[in-house]
């Protein structure tokens, strides 16, 4: 662990609310409109917010910063989180479709271990995440009944809540990882 002076100074772009990532006028998660009506639109709204948050935590960083590991022995990095969430989106689609889909990155933990400081790896990770999110979203759009049970016994509702929980948990990790990289803070 480095000395205190080795740590980046904490900072935020926000001027209105210093505990935020950016000011409300610049925050893509902010909406002046009413909150969604209904359970499914509410779940989708929360999921969207966490997806945007993950992207925001990674913005402005180069491949080395994105691939920087957290605290040993962890292999966690911001780039690893992007790859991991692409992998779990693929897994969820397998649940929905009732079939086993081959892993994107191979063996267990390859999503984190393969997160290296290479622009091609970064570009591929973002492309994988966008593709897998869209594919899982499309598979779920065909099943609007939240009470429907999948082949493995999981309800669509449970899957949606699990997706939100997975993104929320990893956005918390991303908060800490980003602060360690360059000191930027804010929710």
Predicted regions and their residues:
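Active-site rim elements
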Residues: 37-43, 122-123
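Acidic/histidine-rich alpha-helical segments that form the ligand environment
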Residues: 110-147, 158-163
């Amino acid at each position: 662990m480095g000395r205190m002076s080795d740590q980046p100074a904490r900072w935020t772009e926000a001027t209105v609310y210093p505990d935020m990532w950016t000011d409300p006028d610049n925050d893509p998660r902010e909406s002046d409109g009413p909150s969604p009506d209904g359970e499914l639109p509410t779940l989708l709204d929360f999921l969207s917010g966490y997806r945007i948050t993950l992207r925001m935590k990674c913005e402005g960083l180069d491949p080395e910063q994105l691939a920087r590991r957290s605290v040993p022995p962890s292999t966690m990095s911001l780039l690893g989180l992007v790859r991991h969430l692409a992998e779990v989106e693929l897994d969820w689609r397998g649940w929905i479709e009732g079939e086993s889909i081959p892993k994107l990155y191979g063996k267990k933990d390859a999503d984190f271990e393969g997160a290296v400081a290479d622009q091609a790896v970064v570009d591929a990770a973002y492309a994988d995440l966008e593709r897998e999110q869209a594919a899982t979203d499309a598979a779920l759009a065909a099943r609007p009944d939240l009470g429907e049970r999948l082949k493995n016994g999981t309800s669509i509702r449970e899957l949606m809540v699990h997706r939100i929980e997975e993104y929320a948990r990893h956005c918390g990790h991303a908060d800490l990882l980003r602060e360690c990289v360059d000191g930027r803070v804010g929710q």
